Amino acid sequence: MMSSRTDTDGSSIRFSDHTLDKATKAKVTLENYYSNLVTQYGERKQRLAKLEAQLKDESLTESQRQEKRLQHAQKETEYLRLKRLRLGVEDFEALKVIGRGAFGEVRLVQKKDTGHVYAMKVLRKADMLEKEQVAHVRAERDVLVEADHQWVVKMYYSFQDQVNLYLIMEFLPGGDMMTLLMKKDTLSEEGTQFYISETALAIDSIHKLGFIHRDIKPDNLLLDARGHLKLSDFGLCTGLKKSHRTDFYRDLSQAKPSDFIGTCASPMDSKRRAESWKRNRRALAYSTVGTPDYIAPEVFLQTGYGPACDWWSLGVIMYEMLMGYPPFCSDNPQDTYRKVMNWRETLIFPPEIPISEEAKETIIKFCCEADRRLGSQRGLEDLKSVPFFRGVDWEHIRERPAAIPVEVRSIDDTSNFDEFPDVSLEIPSAPIPQGGEIAKDWVFINYTYKRFEVRNLE
């Protein structure tokens, strides 16, 4: 196929699509190369400034300070050497499949040269292109690079081959909140307070970085070996970058209110709703459609939304922890969507499951208009004065015992994850297209990453 471009003198110049694709790839490659140089220089300056600040706080002699500076310089040299090493799937041994999502799988793997255990997320490039997931993949990788703190699952490496994208992340053996809720049915108010507080701290931390998660749900709340929580799955996260924009919710938001009239499922008591929810929950987690149960109404409307949408999701999770099912659950996504959009009438608290007025009021403050929503004005500070969170040690909560202890027998214990006996351990692959590369492969340029701290693990 041929495409035309207009020259400066007004004449039309015709180029083949192949030529235009090559030109685009060259442009993106050069832009990323120089952007990386600037970023790396800035990161080195930040690490050096952090070291100098630490040296000022320590009572050291000048010779001791100089020794630490030399050690730091050596670490920087080792990191540059590590970055030049090409990492591939052959450097890891697959131990077990521990997760399946709509667009990929997660494996427990062991790095062959060090023996360290990681979680490897594998995404097929062809699927990402076909299902318009490139922006989501880019967003997840970029957020995991930037969000380097205790409330977000740590990514150590990202790399690619001609078929797949790979994210190498820390393995959190406690499983996820969805699995915990399916085991426990409901949590006590004390346990709910603990997990909602930790999730609030995690949400607040990414908001301070300028990101909105948009997909806060139990599946994406992972538990470490001590039972403390970390946020994961940033595929729908949005920030300030154009590459993170998405039309993910376009289909549902274009539906007319009349499309949902008369489709509401027949009323069920709370016990039947909980049983129905548990029966279908796992399948929803693995489907490409997913569930709209945790999505704020303003996200569906696409009239503009901000960080407040994550606080709505937190309120829905809090309701589920106490009731055994989310407030808007239905037999199908259309009914759920209708209930979310009509939350003033559908957010109800069944009398057969008694909860405190403080808990009820907190949920209502989360699940309300965006501009009045708890967390929408001052973030975490809004929560600290709420009676339900009375007694929470916000500064040291992660140092305290978790509400529900996690039993971990070894570094590769997967007992808190689902079993996938029918899934091969072999990394999924596909025939490489003629010519040796996937069309539009340039969209994955600059995906490769190695974290500075990883040199301590080598």
Curated annotation (Swiss-Prot):
General function of this protein: Serine/threonine-protein kinase involved in controlling cell structure and proliferation of a variety of polarized outgrowths including epidermal hairs, bristles, arista laterals, and dendrites. Together with fry, maintains the integrity of epidermal hairs and is an essential component of the signaling pathway regulating dendritic branching of sensory neurons. Reduces neurite outgrowth by phosphorylating pav/pavarotti, thereby inhibiting its function in microtubule-microtubule sliding.
Modified residues (Phosphothreonine): 448
Protein's name according to its UniProt entry: Serine/threonine-protein kinase tricornered
Stored InterPro entries: AGC-kinase_C, Kinase-like_dom_sf, Pkinase_C, Prot_kinase_dom, Protein_kinase_ATP_BS, Rho-assoc_Ser/Thr_Kinase, Ser/Thr_kinase_AS
Organism field: Drosophila pseudoobscura pseudoobscura (Fruit fly)
UniProt lineage: Eukaryota, Metazoa, Ecdysozoa, Arthropoda, Hexapoda
Interaction with mats and Mob1: annotated span: 118-179
Its EC number(s): 2.7.11.1
Domain Protein kinase, residue spans: 92-389
Gene from which this protein is expressed: trc
